Design a protein with these regions (language model features):
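Short amphipathic helical patch at the helix-1/turn junction of helix-turn-helix
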Residues: 79, 113-114
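A short beta-loop-alpha structural element at the N-terminal edge
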Residues: 1-11
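Acetyl-CoA-dependent GNAT
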Residues: 10-76, 80-82, 93, 152
Length: 153
């Protein structure tokens, strides 16, 4: 992971980063923490970052984590504000799903905030189904106010 990749990730996840800024002393600390997280994340072969590009520009991305053999978890699915409602998120989810299927994935879970209707629709359009299971993320943490969705491949 080089500085250019980290800078592109900051741009891609600008909204999420702004939401997290209050958890740090300042923006520099937050960016340093995120850069360290990203480097560690990518070094793990069971964790991947995927991006969709348009004319060599990153327009959306997601992180995928293999929580157990054949079971993957999508997190941080985000499209840049100026690129939304153009189908890029669906395209990315479908590309990543096909890639993971090719390496043996059987199931993909994701957790979506109950009020994020556009994300719920996007995932549903890609075949994800709402479950009645507790919204536990790939790190084993319960995320209140969210819904667990699953795609059986």
């Amino acid at each position: 992971v080089n500085e250019q990749v980290i800078e592109k990730m900051f741009l891609l996840y600008a909204e999420s980063m702004a939401d997290m800024e209050g958890e740090f002393k300042n923006r520099d600390e937050m960016e340093a923490s995120y850069a360290a997280f990203l480097k560690e994340f990518i070094e793990n072969p069971k964790q991947m970052v995927f991006v969709e590009t348009v004319e060599k520009q990153w327009v959306c991305g997601l992180r995928a984590v293999e929580s157990e053999p054949g079971k993957w978890f999508f997190e941080a699915v985000e499209t840049m504000p100026g690129q939304r409602n153009r189908g890029y998120g669906k395209k990315l989810i479908r590309h990543v799903t096909e890639f993971l299927k090719g390496i043996g994935a059987k199931k993909i879970d994701c957790i979506i905030v109950k009020s994020n209707l556009s994300s719920i629709k996007m995932h549903s359009d890609c075949g994800f189904k709402e479950t009645k299971e507790p919204p536990v993320n790939c790190w084993g943490e319960l995320e209140e106010g969210r819904i667990l969705f699953r795609l059986e491949i």
